Amino acid sequence: MNRRKFLQSGIAIGAAGVCASPILAGQFTGRIRKSLKYSMIDVRLSLVQQFQLLKRADFDGVEISLRDGLSPQEVRAATDATEIAVHGVIHGAGDDCSASIDLCEQVGGSTVLVVAPELDNLSYADNFARSLAVVRKAIPLAEKQNVRLLIENVRASFLKTAEEMARFIDELESPAIGAYYDTGNTITWTKQTAQHWAHVLGHRIVKVDIKDRGHAEFGDPKLKSQTAVGTDGGEVHWANVRRELAAVNFSGWASAEVKGGDARRLSGVSKWMDQVLDL
C-alpha cells in the first residue's frame, strides 16, 4: 500500500459516522531528506526553474560541485525562491579542497564530499598517511566555515573495506570529519555487503548516497553482481540497510546518484527513493 495516500477503508462506529483515514508514515519519514546530484538535471532551464522542477518531483535539496559553474549568488537566489536547499558540495579527490569548502559555506551547505584516492606508485601505508595529511590540512578551514568533510567509499580509493574507512576517519580525531556512505559503491568493488558497510561505519555516517547499479531501471543490469542479493531487483538489500541506519538513529540527507534526465525521469528517481528508504 502506498503510504503517501489516504487509506480508503473506514470503520463505521454506530451513529458516530466513519473514522477518519490516517496517512501511513514510513520508517524514515521525517528523518531523511531527499536530494540528488545537480549534474543529474538534464533540462535546459534557469537555475530557479530547475529547482522548481526538483520541488515538483518531491526533492528537498541538491548537491553541487565547482564543476557545475554556479555562482553562490544565483544558488542563494534559487534557494530563496524555491526552498530547495543546496546542502553540500562534491569535491572529490583533489588535494586542495579549500575552494569547495568556501563554496559550501557561501551557498549555505553543511558538508564537502572528499575522496581518499589510491595512488598506484604508493604503498597502502603511504597512501593512508598521505591522505590523512591532506584531510588534516583542510580541517581548520572546514571548522572555521562550519563545514564538515565527509569521506566517501569509492572505487578509486585505497580504503577497500568498511573497517579501513572507519579507522581512517577515527585517526583524524575531529568532529569535522564523518562518512558519506554510498550504498552502491560497497558492492561494485568490494566483497562486503551494503549493510555491512552501514553497520561498521555506524555513527560516523552523516549522509548517504543512494545507488544500486544492479537495478533494472535506476542502475545498469550489465554490472549486476552475481552474488549480491537485493530487495528491489538489484544488488542492495535495502531492508537490511534501513535496519542498520535505524540502529544508529540516522537522520539527514540522502542523495540519489544515478542516471538523471528530464522531469519525468527525476520524478521516477524520487519515487524510487521513497520506496527503498521507506519514506
Q: Which residues fall in each region the model found?
A:
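Catalytic domains of carbohydrate-active enzymes, especially glycoside hydrolases
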Residues: 50-69
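Conserved beta-strand positions in the central sheet of alpha/beta enzyme cores
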Residues: 63, 88, 113, 206-209, ...
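Short amphipathic alpha-helices and their capping/turn segments at secondary-structure boundaries
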Residues: 72-78, 96-106, 193-203
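Active-site acidic/histidine proton-transfer and metal-coordination neighborhood
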Residues: 10-19, 28, 68, 88-181, ...
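Short acidic, glycine/proline-enriched helix-loop-strand junctions
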Residues: 71-89, 147
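Short glycine/serine/threonine/alanine-rich loop segments
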Residues: 59, 84, 109, 147, ...
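Histidine-acidic metal/acid-base catalytic patches
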Residues: 2-35, 40, 44-56, 108, ...
